[in-house]
Amino acid sequence: LATIIYQNQIFDKKQIQALNLNTIEDIYLRDSLLFCQKWLQGCEIVEVKTSGSTGTPKVIFPTRHALQASVAMSQKFFAWQGGEKALVCLHTQYIAGKMMLLRGLELGWTMYLQTPNNNPLATFEQNLDFAAFVPLQMQNILENTPQKLMLFSQNANIIIGGASVSHHLETMIASVGNPKIFQTYGMTETLSHVAIRRLNGSSQKNFFPLEQVQIRLNEQNCLCISSPTTLFQEIVTNDIAEIYEDGSFRILGRADNIINSGGVKIQLEQVEQEIEKIFEQIGLQRRFYCIGTPDNYWGEMLTLCIEGEKLPENTEDKLQKSFQGLSNKHFIPKKITYQTHFTETETGKVKRQALL
């Protein structure tokens, strides 16, 4: 039977249904239990917010049937038998957190609910079969408490989603023996993941769609998805992709992250992937993003925006020299700017528009 454990409180299905939620002061617990209560009462439509990292947050209203299809797709892929122990440490007003709760309710899991924080395993001591993390959480676990991965059972799985996985994090994950760790691809509109790639063990370069998920590219090379979670209605994403003969695909970047600099189209994510390796080589541990800033000569000038204080002059010189090794001369930033703190959404995604 599905159970939610939060700090020292235990709630089973019957208790959740009977709860007077006005008596619960903890906002995260109350919101999570309210969602569970509505689901257990048989609601046919669920309200879900998008994170707003790529624009104004919006609300969608998926059906119960579509949400159950998402649970079934994941259950088939991960071969869940029911009764698993899972850690729920994501914001439950967004789709990733809601889907964790729904999998638990539908499959009779024991769910350890935890207010989202940077290292969910820091003080955690229970055995686990499944967890979903954002990349920042996974990185903190591996850097600060790698021994906590021993809490995961032999057949356990971890999924990572919500933001891109850096080259540095991917390298760390590749050396983890157990549990199996996957990166997911999906969005609010597809009711969490519709494709998956393995990051350790027999790792994969590309995402593989889950069963019954159909993909194609439109004329702009944007990925179009049809799946049980969309009730087989096609969703046109903003993600520029490549699809391969084996049915797998790779995301190159977002259509709205292409700039036109002096007549040359540049996909910002491709530049960032190369610059990230340069940061690693010179031992620079800072967050950064590439943006196109308006310019009379270039139209949009490729600009590297680094989080934090201005770098010492010798470090910035070293960085500029390293740029000469980039695979494409158009990938060399024309300008470096600094921002004390990047603006983030509630789910920890950086708002690129705020960098301009």
Model-derived features: positions:
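Conserved pre-ATP/AMP-binding loop-to-beta segment of ANL
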Residues: 31-49, 83
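AMP-binding/adenylate-forming catalytic core of the ANL superfamily
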Residues: 238-331
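Gly/Ser/Thr-rich phosphate-binding loop
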Residues: 145-201
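AMP-binding/adenylate-forming catalytic domain of the ANL superfamily
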Residues: 326-349
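Conserved AMP-binding A3 loop
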Residues: 45-72, 79
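AMP-binding/adenylate-forming core of the ANL superfamily
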Residues: 214-236, 240-242, 248
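Conserved ATP-dependent adenylate/AMP-binding module captured primarily in the ANL superfamily
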Residues: 1-26, 68-87, 117-129
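AMP-binding/adenylate-forming
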Residues: 62-69, 85-140
